């Protein structure tokens, strides 16, 4: 019997990792091996069973959060329970949380604080690991200093990342631009969507880490 075009097609892939708190049409949305949870699905309700890559909202935990509280009354940590839910998912199903470096959520939830000068992973009493990494080394237009928290992956399986600082702190922004304003200035001129976007190469690193959880 001659096989039909449908029978020759590749079988559909089942999701291997859940991506929580992501943009609806962002870099995770069309990956067949990823179960994407944008705002419309409310990732706080995620109940497994897949390991996760979590990008919980960061504005209430950033280095400017205290200023915003004083100036605008927006309380530090008042994110509707998003970070707490992300942490619960990571500790229950394994995976990784991505947040801006110096996020106040680390101290609030007792996570191991990375050292910006340490090229490697920092172990915590909880059994997880944190690290400092700059997304500019993975294609982001500015350095985008980042902290990661991983749970459910043994130390010997944690990958070596591109440690260290992005050359001249400018990421891939064109060298003919005098860009010394950093992430905040670039976000103001370009928009939060571009600033918050995860470079595809860095996304793949996070997915690889999550896929090793509880293996």
Write out the residue ranges for each language-model feature.
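Class I S-adenosyl-L-methionine
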Residues: 1-215
């Amino acid at each position: 019997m001659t096989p039909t075009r449908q029978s020759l097609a590749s079988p559909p892939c089942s999701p291997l990792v859940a991506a929580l708190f992501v943009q609806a049409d962002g870099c995770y949305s069309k990956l067949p091996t990823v179960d994407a949870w944008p705002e419309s699905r409310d990732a706080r309700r995620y109940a497994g069973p897949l390991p996760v890559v979590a990008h919980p909202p960061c504005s209430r935990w950033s280095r400017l959060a205290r200023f915003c509280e004083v100036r605008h009354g927006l309380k530090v940590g008042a994110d509707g329970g998003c970070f707490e839910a992300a942490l619960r998912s990571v500790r229950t199903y394994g995976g990784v949380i991505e947040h801006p470096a110096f996020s106040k959520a680390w101290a609030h939830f007792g996570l191991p604080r990375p050292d910006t000068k340490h090229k490697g992973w920092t172990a915590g009493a909880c059994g997880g690991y944190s690290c400092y990494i700059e997304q500019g080394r993975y294609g982001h237009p500015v350095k985008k200093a980042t902290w990661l928290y991983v749970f459910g992956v043994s130390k010997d399986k944690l990958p070596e990342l591109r440690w260290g600082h992005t050359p001249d702190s400018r990421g891939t922004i064109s060298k003919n631009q005098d860009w010394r304003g950093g992430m905040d200035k670039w976000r103001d001129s370009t928009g939060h969507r571009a600033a918050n976007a995860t470079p595809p190469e860095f996304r793949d690193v996070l997915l690889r880490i999550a896929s090793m959880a509880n293996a």
